[in-house]
Amino acid sequence: MKSIWLLGNPISHSLSPTFQNAGLQYLNIEAEYSVRQVDDGELDKVMTEMRSGDVLGANITIPYKTTIMEQMDEIDPFATSVGAVNTVLVQRKNSGTRLVGYNTDVRGIIDPIINREFTLSSSRAVLIGTGGAALSAFQALVSLGFSHVDIVARNIVAAATFANRSPSVEVQIHNLNHIEHDTFASLIARADLMVQATPVGMTSGLSPNISPVPEDVMKLGLTNSLGPILVFELVYAPRETVFLRHAREYGNDKAVYIEGLEMLLHQGAESFKIWTEQSAPCL
């Protein structure tokens, strides 16, 4: 039986094996999707095993979505433009084995937003984070037509690189460690969309019971919102994070909320098709 791996750390909380294996079984594909925790310094060894083993491919999650790119023999042009890979296809031919990297996270973010038929009023967005998920979220914002993105993050050096990714988008950077609460709240109040793209709040992470947005900031920002706002949480375990709970508590009746589980399902369906060349039965 062939294998498909989920590589990352932490990954004990992942729901991907449940729906990926359900799809494989439904279509009678002889393959099993399983988690493979990769500790610091182990990535090279794991990728060597992937090349030599009976592996169809893999999903890549925190913290390897950018560093995995160095291991690829080929990267899909779209993934290159995003700057992150979350899906690997193992191509085995007479000439040898090649690892091809793709990004399905962007589709996983765009599709749930489009499905909401949400109308943009200001074309402004707030993006929290600068990691691989944030890179995908930024590309999704570009594709959706946002003209201004406020990036709020601790890694200011990484945040500065976002401005070079799309000249058509005005990017302003704010240090999460030093931004005044009133300033942070005003960014939220003016935004059409706020995306939480850090691992903060994740069940098996280092900070499972907190939000990157202080509660008073969330309250002030959402109660003073200038129009409808869509709040997108990319963390899916727990299903309702502290960030999402506060957003629901203080958002007005026109606010829209998207849970991370929706992104997981949509990006997972795209990955499934890359590995199997068949559409996932779950969507």
Predicted regions and their residues:
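Glycine-rich adenosine-cofactor-binding loop
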Residues: 8, 103-106, 113-146, 153-156
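Short acidic active-site motifs
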Residues: 42-46, 179-184
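Short glycine-/small-residue-rich Rossmann-like dinucleotide-binding loops
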Residues: 63, 196-200, 235-236
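Rossmann-like NAD(P)-binding element
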Residues: 181-213, 223-227
